[in-house]
Amino acid sequence: MNYLGGFFMKNLLSMEDLTNEEILSLVKRALELKKRAENKKRNDLFVANLFFENSTRTKKSFEVAEKKLNLNVVDFEVSTSSVQKGETLYDTCKTLEMIGINMLVIRHSENEYYKQLENLKIPIINGGDGSGEHPSQCLLDIMTIYETYGKFDGLNIIIVGDIKNSRVARSNKKALTRLGAKVTFVAPEIWKDESLGEFVNFDDVIDKVDICMLLRVQHERHTDSKEKREFSKENYHKSFGLTEERYKRLKEGAIIMHPAPVNRDVEIADSLVESEKSRIFEQMRNGMFMRQAILEYIIEKNKL
């Protein structure tokens, strides 16, 4: 929970903003929405989606979720906005607030960008901040896991890939550990962040995990020339990708996850993206329902 603009307001900026009870409540609400559509009249509420980084799934599923909730979605394109004239993020958001926008969904390349928005008087949903956090992705991942297993206690989860630059890894580690799962990481040495937890050898644990979560290599965040120089698709797939050989070692009942976009034959063999154990496209489907639940939650908590 956050204090912004000098008064109490409920935002969703980090997984730390949610209690375990709130996480489970959101999961159950999203599953309800998945089973049956509801259309409450909210024609008087306006939402703007500000995406300063490229996005397909997060942006479009928020848009669909907003329209399913009968919200008025205001089109905002960074490329045609006054951001191109040097306007600050705060001034852009304050302008939208002053013309009647009721809430914002924001993705930005800067970690914790929302700290500069403390004087806003409308709620913010974080659509991803740099390599910081991605709460809505984490919540849809939690929903997908709960839908499969009905629990978190005792689950063994590995997150594999570019951990150092991944907001998904950070959000999932925080929330899933709190919910009772064991989360460990697999990564090339150059993309490790030891502060997040334990790193293990992929081949030592592949046959013991319940969930194998694969991450995209985040080329756009690689500023070190060594990172770029050492990366090879073939070598990465051989050492850190889910190959067909590793897939065969997964135990019965194990599932594969990936926040997408997927680099086929890099993080995962092309033939496995829609395999029996894969939940990758189901995650995308669940994303829209979870984002509906998040929007409802923010509307209700802020009495909009």
UniProtKB/Swiss-Prot annotation:
Annotated L-aspartate binding lies at K85, R167, R216
* Residues the entry annotates as binding carbamoyl phosphate: R57, T58, R107, H134, Q137, A260, P261
Q: Which GO terms describe its biological process?
A: 'de novo' pyrimidine nucleobase biosynthetic process; 'de novo' UMP biosynthetic process; amino acid metabolic process
Its pathway, per UniProt, is:
Pyrimidine metabolism; UMP biosynthesis via de novo pathway; (S)-dihydroorotate from bicarbonate: step 2/3
Q: Does the keyword Lyase apply?
A: no
The top EC class is transferase
Give the enzyme's EC designation.
2.1.3.2
UniProt keyword list = Pyrimidine biosynthesis, Transferase
Q: Which GO terms describe its molecular function?
A: amino acid binding; aspartate carbamoyltransferase activity
Question: Does the keyword Iron belong to this entry?
Answer: no
- A Pfam family (short name) is OTCace
Recorded catalytic reaction(s): these are: carbamoyl phosphate + L-aspartate = N-carbamoyl-L-aspartate + phosphate + H(+)
Q: Which family does it belong to?
A: Belongs to the aspartate/ornithine carbamoyltransferase superfamily. ATCase family.
PANTHER family hit by this protein: ASPARTATE CARBAMOYLTRANSFERASE, ORNITHINE CARBAMOYLTRANSFERASE, MITOCHONDRIAL
Q: How does it assemble?
A: Heterododecamer (2C3:3R2) of six catalytic PyrB chains organized as two trimers (C3), and six regulatory PyrI chains organized as three dimers (R2).
Main function = Catalyzes the condensation of carbamoyl phosphate and aspartate to form carbamoyl aspartate and inorganic phosphate, the committed step in the de novo pyrimidine nucleotide biosynthesis pathway.
Q: Any idea what this protein is called?
A: Aspartate carbamoyltransferase catalytic subunit
The record lists the organism as Fusobacterium nucleatum subsp. nucleatum (strain ATCC 25586 / DSM 15643 / BCRC 10681 / CIP 101130 / JCM 8532 / KCTC 2640 / LMG 13131 / VPI 4355)
Organismal lineage: Bacteria, Fusobacteriati, Fusobacteriota, Fusobacteriia, Fusobacteriales
- The gene for this chain is pyrB
